[in-house]
Amino acid sequence: MEIAALVSGGVDSSVVVHQLKEAGYDPTIFYIRIGMEDKDGYIDCPAEEDIEITSYIARKYGCRFEIVSLHDEYWDRVVSYTIESVKRGLTPNPDMMCNKYIKFGCFEEKWGKDFDKIATGHYATTTEIDGKTWLSTAKDPVKDQTDFLGQITRLQIQKLMFPIGHLMKSEVRAIAEAQKLPSAKRKDSQGICFLGKINYNDFIERYLGKRPGKIVELETGKVLGKHNGYWFHTIGQRKGLGLSGGPWFVIQKDIKRNIIYVSNGYDPETQYGKVINMQGFDFITEDPWGEFEGEKEITFKIRHTPEFTHGYIRRIGDLYRVESDEKIQGIAPGQYSVIYDKDHHLCLGSGMIIDETK
């Protein structure tokens, strides 16, 4: 079996190569250069150390090694999407778009098509049911990354391998240390890759500029201060508002009037909701329900967290609606609600959250 292993230089993808070799495979290692390019040139993830480590892994295990670039595709599919989403007052999820369109989309079209499987360091597993492949959760509930994979397709999941999905993070690090891999003690990556060391607000300002507006208390209508543009703020945000007498949380955004609405307190009721409307829904393997009336029991996530929330999903025309058993903090339009079966084992798919008041 011909396997392409996507290796970033981090501990997880490095251990993927070890696991594949232990299983008797001879993977070809690919390092994907991603980042962004505009008229002023590249703003890239710091890649030199990553490539050096990945090259060492390839030599250690005797694997073929290729460095490939998807800069332009990353700009078109991920960076532009992020900028446009923020401009529309939405909260983007670039990680989901990168997995769907870059790692398992453009890479597949250019190089992956020549391989039987693509292996990655995601904390996820696959489950075979009646000859069909389903995305399923990892052994490590804290590191589980199925929510970042909630937009992939049936054809993509059929081809994916997750060699560390059955391991705890501590086990992965132990393997890396035992094998003396240079990535054994590297910290996990944080934040949006294409920004590198660039501050997120500096990035937003570069492409959207500033537009001063009012910060208003939701309950009273009192003007509390000013902001530099609604696109610098997201629903549920607490830090960076510059207001005294806090804590303050961003509750709503009026993008037409450029107003940020906030509520005061450590746990304001206004930041919670129980209804999540999704604009369409993308199933990964297949629609397990078909046409149905009433509701289906599910678990779900609206952000990257170890916890699953229990609820029910309904179909209203083309709209899917999740009704949560418990109140959810910071339901942000633009983010994705990732849906699982009631036992939170199978990841069924996801839909983009729209304003729940509509």
From Swiss-Prot:
Q: Which GO terms describe its biological process?
A: tRNA modification
Summary of the function given for this chain in its UniProt record = Catalyzes the 2-thiolation of uridine at the wobble position (U34) of tRNA, leading to the formation of s(2)U34.
Residues at site: Interaction with tRNA? Answer: H122, Q335
Q: Does the keyword Magnesium apply?
A: no
**Gene name tied to this protein:** mnmA
Q: What's the short name of a Pfam family annotated to this entry?
A: tRNA_Me_trans_M
Q: Annotated region Interaction with tRNA: where?
A: 143-145
Q: Where is the active site?
A: C98 (nucleophile), C193 (cysteine persulfide intermediate)
Q: Which GO terms describe its cellular component?
A: cytoplasm
Per its record, the protein catalyses: S-sulfanyl-L-cysteinyl-[protein] + uridine(34) in tRNA + AH2 + ATP = 2-thiouridine(34) in tRNA + L-cysteinyl-[protein] + A + AMP + diphosphate + H(+)
Name of the molecule in the record:
tRNA-specific 2-thiouridylase MnmA
